Amino acid sequence: MPGNSFGKLFRVTTFGESHGPAVGVVIDGVPAGLPLTVEDIKFELEFRRPGRLYVSGRREKDEPEILSGIFNNRTTGSPIAVIVRNTDVVSSFYEEIRYKPRPGHADLPFIMKYGYENWDYRGGGRASARETVGRVIAGAVAKKLLMLADTWIAGHLRSLGPEELNEEVTFEEVLCSKYSPVRASKKVLEEKYEALIKKATQEGDSYGGIAEVITKNPPIGLGEPVFDKMKAELAKAIMSIPAVTGFEYGLGFMVSKMKGSEANDEIIRKDNKIGWKYNYAGGILGGLTNGEDLIVRCAFKPTSSIRKPQKTIDLRNLEETYISVIGRHDPAVAIRGVTVVESMVALTLVDHAMRAGVIPLVKLTEEQGNIVQQRWERYVRSCKPMEESQL
């Protein structure tokens, strides 16, 4: 099963299955001298951890164990290996799907490709969103390394089911959405999302949603003009996330309904610098980052595993039957998915920042390490509940 690695210079390989002993990641290419602790990783992991309000009831502590690559709270330049042990596994929930593939899930395609006898039906195996633990761990490292360029990344849930944000949102509000149980950037929207989730849970159903991630102060010129355009790199990274079905940046598909005179973003002076009036392009032109806020969105489909009975095939006799999936599943995977999208944006940007020479390949100086640490601490302080930010 190839295709488990991402990136060229900052290279990430995830491993593990949903109901195996552990999931984890190996991160290769991290320069020496980056201040990094378990707490830095746990800060990001907490926002995708199950067992919280409105998400999967699986009670995982998600305690990262660093196996290599860090000494005295600094990276050594060698590969960083981190595992998270699976401590709340209940495989008995999945005995029925052993013979009844779930509609909307990867069960049947996996059986068709790898063979029934090789299929790990427990919790979806490698196709489970549990795999994204490794992405978020690597994303935490990437986010901290990007602090060298003072680049900040934060996301929120732009829509959930029929409810959506129809007003402007500040980056500070997006940062604070980390502490919203439904990743809403506005209090009134949070209440609407919560009502939808409660309704879906009662009905044994689920909802999809749209995640939006904003990158402040991205380095200029990241990406390459042809096959490695930044939009293409981000699209691949984000579309690789389980349950993601669509990607756009800037105005996205809306631009197809506009005239050139409407869609072209005028070039103006902004704070004594050259810039764009509205940032319609979402921070990418010609495949390169242009210094404006990098704005991407992606669509998450509704959780496939639901209690409502759905038609499927019993593989023992190839007859049609029904399945009602019993287990601990998210009523909306998009909620925890926001953190994963942030991580994939960070992994893409840090890899290109290293390719462009913005971030050193070998080591950070002591001064650079101190700058990174100061900015990271400011970032962590800025991520606080809405009430504390008086939103």
Swiss-Prot record:
Reactions performed catalytically: 5-O-(1-carboxyvinyl)-3-phosphoshikimate = chorismate + phosphate
InterPro entries: Chorismate_synth, Chorismate_synth_AroC_sf, Chorismate_synthase_CS
Known cofactor(s): FMNH2
Residues involved in FMN binding: 126-128, 286, 301-305, 328
Keyword terms, alphabetized: Amino-acid biosynthesis, Aromatic amino acid biosynthesis, FAD, Flavoprotein, FMN, Lyase, NADP
Cellular component per GO, a single term: cytosol
Pfam families: Chorismate_synt (PF01264)
Protein residues bound to NADP(+): 48
CDD domains in the cross-refs: Chorismate_synthase
Lyase keyword on record: yes
GO-annotated molecular function: chorismate synthase activity; FMN binding
UniProt cofactor note: Reduced FMN (FMNH(2)).
Functional pathway: Metabolic intermediate biosynthesis; chorismate biosynthesis; chorismate from D-erythrose 4-phosphate and phosphoenolpyruvate: step 7/7
Highest taxon above the source species: Archaea
Assigned EC number: 4.2.3.5
GO biological process, any: aromatic amino acid family biosynthetic process
PANTHER family named in the record: CHORISMATE SYNTHASE (PTHR21085:SF0)
HAMAP family xrefs: Chorismate_synth
Family, as annotated: Belongs to the chorismate synthase family.
Function description: This reaction introduces a second double bond into the aromatic ring system.
Name of the protein described by the UniProt record: Chorismate synthase
Source species of the chain: Saccharolobus islandicus (strain M.16.27) (Sulfolobus islandicus)
